[in-house]
Amino acid sequence: MILAVFCSFTVSAEKTISSECSIDDINVPIETEETNASIGQTLDIKAKSFILMEPNTKKILYEANADEKLSPASITKVMPLLLVMEAIDRKDITLETVVTASEHACSMGGSQIWLEPGESMTVDELLKATVIASANDACVALGELIAGSEEGFVALMNERAKELGMDNTTFKNCTGLDAEGHLTTAHDVAIMSSELIKHELIKKYSTVWMDSLRDGQSELVNTNKLVRFYKGTTGLKTGTTSIAKYCLSATAERDGLELVAVVLAGETSNDRFNGAKKLLDYGFANYSFTSVKADLKETEKEILDGVKKKVKVSADGTVDILLSKKESKDIKKTTVWNENIKAPIKKGDVLGYVIVNQGENEIGKIEIKALEDVEKLGFLVTFRWILNGIFNL
């Protein structure tokens, strides 16, 4: 009965949704005890390659063999999902856009929702199937919608990977099914995962444990067990093939700190989940953001060639700095002005920066902006002054 709940979901009397799962997914629990490893300690993770990254700064907090090229299985789908999110942002498509399944999309093996050629679903429904159940047919249907063909979509995937600096990645398909030369790294997966979670919409799908399609006839259960069992989980994607073994890109957020943990080539399904959990525990236990304020309240800065000798300025922004909880808080701020600040000046012009340093390293800067307009001192302005002086006599 338990096996049926996780691995076999009713579509009709004849078909069941095929999903990434196995007996050990069901019978072996995820470790519940939190990892309390400190910085410098080694994490016991049973996988060939893994990484922990803070997605905004792209700072690597822990890694092992993170640049080794490996097969990613369905973690590949992070890139198609990113391209779909970007297409929605551009208003090229909407969640209500209807997609008609092609014969090619319906021919996919592996995880699938058994789309029939000519069957129609909305982008919203196909996203559910792709994110929650890792459905290959749904993913290809989305790719064909955006690029006209899977081949064209894969070209877009590789182009976007290059733009993101994923230098060790080559996609051969959009599903992650094993193919010669279809390779990436844990580091590159962390980069594209970081980009995907900038889109809050993805979390509408990646945080869901169970959902359904076809008016409730087709049940979906998330292949990412952390969604149910790990506090703060926000997604993201599992992957399993005979070559790639067990893979996971997992995202979680606690107390304003969001992290991306990637595990590639685990020997068992729970190796990937326990590995990601250990990485996330390590990050949350050892790192946090510190907010540094500019604290440059309204003041004046001398300028050249203006009707006034000084302009009012201020800097009221903040810089959020990712620091280890044991790291030195040796934070210093230095005010640096642009050279030869001359009129005319417009309100909002950037005239300098408050530079934030930790030790010798610059870790952020905050703009110093003009609070007013200042005209250039020219002939017409001078002539106007003279006239004002005459009429004031």
For the regions a protein language model found, what residue spans apply to each?
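Sec-dependent N-terminal signal peptides of Gram-positive bacterial secreted proteins and lipoproteins
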Residues: 1-13
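Short, compositionally biased leader-like segments
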Residues: 11-28, 313-329
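Active-site-adjacent loops and short helices of periplasmic peptidoglycan-processing enzymes
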Residues: 13-187, 191-200
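Domain-terminus/edge residues, biased toward the C-terminal soluble/receptor-binding domains
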Residues: 166-170, 178-393
